[in-house]
């Protein structure tokens, strides 16, 4: 058995909470948890604790929620914990060098991609968006750069042709905790080997925007199909269509599509066929088949259900924008 480490855990969302749960079941001791301050959530905008805070409180672990680490008090508070190592998973706050240097073994981070391929805020989404065939989690020794630290462990899995960001999130949330516990065992026993990243292979996974999720029908069908999966569950790929009965423009969210290899001379964005198998739309090259859509005020529905109630919106020749 490896040496037990005194761990400070820093994280905020559910993805991080699953890693914390794994640490609590390991031989290591989680002596404190850092998470972002409670935020307003829901219709009532009630202050809500993070998933990480909830797990910490359930296990009687002290919780710290600084707005940042700029003050000497916040830094000293961490130093007083006398931690061996700090584990950071989707914390959401920048850690200055003084914080990175505080634990005896420094700080390690679980990152949701194979570094250095995708550094930054949205690696899961960007890997699908780019058509990558695999992704994974990288555990790295943190430095002051953005996901630039030396790599301690990489665990990989394939990206399937039907995977969305939501499904990959679940897969990585299952992969990461085991990889983290194994990596900590290597660190505790002195077996961990750090590998420098090749900066020339790095890409920046910038945050997603609603504007980016608007479909450009001049793109290739394959790229649009990947965008639909990458932007699910947020911000959701969408297009605009005019309701012929009211002449109002409606925003339609796209949940599921497939590529049809058929080529067409129809203008990009025009509907060339609509039946229970899908709504067939011309793109910059092939045909994209819309299979599941969401109209304003409704839940996502199959195209067959959409056409039963709103066939006039999706007549052949209609131009989507």
UniProtKB/Swiss-Prot annotation:
It catalyses: L-methionyl-tRNA(fMet) + (6R)-10-formyltetrahydrofolate = N-formyl-L-methionyl-tRNA(fMet) + (6S)-5,6,7,8-tetrahydrofolate + H(+). It comes from the Bacteria. Coiled coil: none annotated. Keywords: Protein biosynthesis, Transferase. InterPro entries: Fmt, Formyl_trans_C, Formyl_trans_C_sf, Formyl_transf_N, Formyl_transf_N_sf, Formyl_transferase-like_C_sf, GART_AS, Met-tRNA-FMT_C. Its EC number is 2.1.2.9. GO terms for cellular component: cytosol. GO terms for molecular function: methionyl-tRNA formyltransferase activity. (6S)-5,6,7,8-tetrahydrofolate binds at residues 113-116. HAMAP family: Formyl_trans. PANTHER family: METHIONYL-TRNA FORMYLTRANSFERASE, METHIONYL-TRNA FORMYLTRANSFERASE, MITOCHONDRIAL. Attaches a formyl group to the free amino group of methionyl-tRNA(fMet). The formyl group appears to play a dual role in the initiator identity of N-formylmethionyl-tRNA by promoting its recognition by IF2 and preventing the misappropriation of this tRNA by the elongation apparatus. Belongs to the Fmt family. This is Methionyl-tRNA formyltransferase. It comes from Vibrio atlanticus (strain LGP32) (Vibrio splendidus (strain Mel32)). The gene is fmt.
């Amino acid at each position: 058995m490896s040496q037990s480490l005194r761990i400070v855990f820093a994280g905020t969302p559910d993805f991080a909470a699953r890693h914390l749960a794994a640490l609590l079941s390991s031989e290591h001791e989680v002596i404190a948890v850092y998470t972002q301050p409670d935020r307003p959530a829901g219709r009532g905008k009630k202050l809500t604790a993070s998933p990480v805070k909830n797990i910490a409180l359930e296990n009687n672990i002290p919780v710290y929620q600084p707005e940042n680490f700029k003050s000497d008090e916040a830094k000293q508070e961490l130093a007083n914990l006398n931690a061996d190592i700090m584990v950071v998973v989707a914390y959401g706050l920048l850690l200055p060098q003084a914080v990175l240097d505080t634990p005896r073994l420094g700080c390690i981070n679980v990152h949701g991609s194979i570094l250095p391929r995708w550094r930054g805020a949205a690696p899961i989404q960007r890997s699908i968006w780019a058509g990558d065939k695999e992704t994974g989690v990288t555990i790295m020794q943190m430095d002051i750069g953005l996901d630039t630290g030396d790599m301690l462990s990489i665990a990989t899995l394939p990206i399937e042709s039907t995977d969305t960001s939501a499904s990959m999130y679940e897969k990585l949330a299952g992969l990461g905790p085991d990889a983290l516990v194994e990596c900590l065992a290597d660190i505790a026993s002195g077996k961990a080997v750090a590998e420098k990243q090749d900066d020339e292979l790095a890409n920046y996974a910038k945050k997603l925007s609603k504007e980016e999720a608007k479909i450009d029908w001049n793109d290739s069908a394959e790229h649009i199909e990947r965008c639909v999966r990458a932007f699910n569950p947020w911000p959701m790929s969408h297009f605009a269509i005019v309701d012929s009965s009211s002449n109002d423009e409606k925003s339609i969210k796209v949940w599921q599509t497939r590529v049809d290899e058929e080529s067409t001379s129809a203008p990009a964005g025009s509907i060339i066929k609509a039946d229970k198998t899908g709504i067939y739309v011309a793109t910059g090259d092939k045909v994209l088949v819309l299979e599941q859509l969401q109209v304003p005020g409704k839940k996502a529905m199959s195209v067959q259900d959409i056409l039963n109630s709103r066939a006039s919106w999706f007549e052949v020749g209609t131009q989507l924008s």
